[in-house]
A protein has these predicted regions:
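P-loop NTPase catalytic phosphate-binding loop
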Residues: 1-128, 178
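Generic secondary-structure transition motif, activating predominantly at the C-termini of alpha-helices
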Residues: 24-27, 133-134, 160, 174-175
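Generic hydrophobic/packing signal
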Residues: 48-51, 81, 130-134, 145-146, ...
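Conserved P-loop NTPase motor module
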Residues: 56, 60-66, 74-75, 115-117, ...
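Phosphate/diphosphate-binding loops
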Residues: 122-127, 131-150
C-alpha cells in the first residue's frame, strides 16, 4: 500500500502514472471527507528530476485529448500541486533548468511552490522564478532560498545529496514518531 504511515515508497518512471493516480485518489478521498483529515498522515512526495518524467508534464490546454475517463497523469499531477497541500499531500521537486520548469508545470502550479531553492542562472530566469535577478550573481557553491510567504531571500551553501543510508535513517525516525 502506498500510504503507510511514514512509509517510504520508491517508484520508477514506469510506475509514476500508477503512483500519481493513487495519490490523486487519496487526495479526492480527503477532499470529500471519506478520509478524515485529522487522522490522515501527511504524505510527502519527492521527485528528483521532474523534467525527466514526461508523463507528468502539463498538457496543452487546447489539445484535443479525450475528455472522458480518468485524468491523465499530467492533469492529476497538476491537481496534486494546486490542491494537495491543503489536504496534507506535499510535493518537493527538483528541476534542472527554468525552461524545464515551464515544460513540467503550468504557471499557476509554479506559484503553489512557495519555497524555492535556486542556483546560479540568468537574470531573466531568476526574476521569473523568485522575482529577483540575484541568482545571476551567485558564485560557486552558493544557492538562494526564496520563501514567498515570508518574503525572504537567503543565501546559503548547499551540500551534496545524502546517501541511501541517510534516507533509511530518516524514514526510521519518522516511523518512530508515529
Amino acid at each position: 500500500m502506498l500510504f503507510r504511515s511514514h512509509g517510504l515508497t520508491l517508484s520508477t518512471a514506469l510506475e509514476i502514472p500508477t503512483v500519481i493516480s493513487e495519490l490523486s485518489t487519496e487526495m479526492k478521498m480527503r477532499a470529500s471527507g471519506l478520509t478524515p483529515l485529522a487522522g490522515a498522515p501527511s504524505v510527502f512526495v519527492f521527485i528528483h528530476g521532474l523534467h525527466k518524467f514526461k508523463k507528468l508534464r502539463q498538457e496543452d490546454e487546447f489539445s484535443f485529448g479525450g475528455g472522458d475517463g480518468e485524468a491523465s497523469p499530467g492533469a492529476a499531477f497538476n491537481d496534486l500541486i494546486t490542491e494537495g497541500s491543503a489536504l496534507g499531500i506535499h510535493l518537493i521537486a527538483a528541476v534542472d533548468s527554468f525552461n524545464n520548469v515551464n515544460r513540467a508545470m503550468s504557471r499557476k502550479a509554479l506559484t503553489e511552490f512557495e519555497m524555492r531553492i535556486v542556483f546560479q542562472m540568468s537574470a531573466n530566469d531568476s526574476a521569473s522564478l523568485i522575482d529577483s535577478p540575484k541568482a545571476s550573481a551567485l558564485g560557486l557553491h552558493r544557492a538562494l532560498l526564496h520563501n514567498e510567504q515570508a518574503g525572504t531571500l537567503e543565501t546559503f551553501r548547499p551540500y551534496a545529496a545524502p546517501d541511501a543510508g541517510w534516507f533509511e535513517h530518516a524514514a526510521e525516525l519518522l516511523a518512530e514518531r508515529r
